[in-house]
Amino acid sequence: MSNQSNNTIPEWILRRLPYNHYNINVDGKNMHVMEKGKGRPIVLVHGNPMWGYLYKKVLDNVNSDKARLIVPDLIGFGFSDKIKIGEHSLEAHTEWMASFFKTIKEESIGLVIHDWGGMIGVAGAMRAGKKIDGLVIMNTSVTAPKDGFTPTWFHSLSQLPVISDLLFRVFNFPLSVLKKF
């Protein structure tokens, strides 16, 4: 584990997310993690195209004496290492999450999952040998999309090579929009 440098995360983000920030190495890639509290570990896994900020209100309102909330940014999202579009697959993300789960000392965890973070989170925890003793499921699936699946316009937009790079890397979308709130 290494502490995330404040130079990497903009100051205005750190003010909104006043938690412990650190990076862990998962198979050669840096995964950014936010953590708050003591007690029972509860891992909150976001979906696509989200990041750990999704759980800000949860982090702000859960009693930190009873729960240790652990919020990783999936590889390629938030403040974790960025990857090429072709590297995003359920299998790759599941392996990265399994490596992440192995860094949690406790055998039993609570798990909050959203979107494709559901499949990635559950499969990663199982591969790491974790016992899931509490589960909150939000807008997810337990299987991969079937043939003929049609992605939303936003998912399609995020797959366009030049346009997605401009939006997400050059214009810092959605961070640039969040600054307005």
Predicted regions and their residues:
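Flexible "cap/lid" subdomain of the alpha/beta-hydrolase fold that forms the substrate-access gate
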Residues: S2-N20, K29-V33, P49, L54, ...
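Conserved residues in the N-terminal Rossmann fold of short-chain dehydrogenase/reductase
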Residues: N23, V71, I113
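Conserved HGGG/HGGXW glycine-rich cap/lid loop of the alpha/beta-hydrolase fold
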Residues: H32-F79
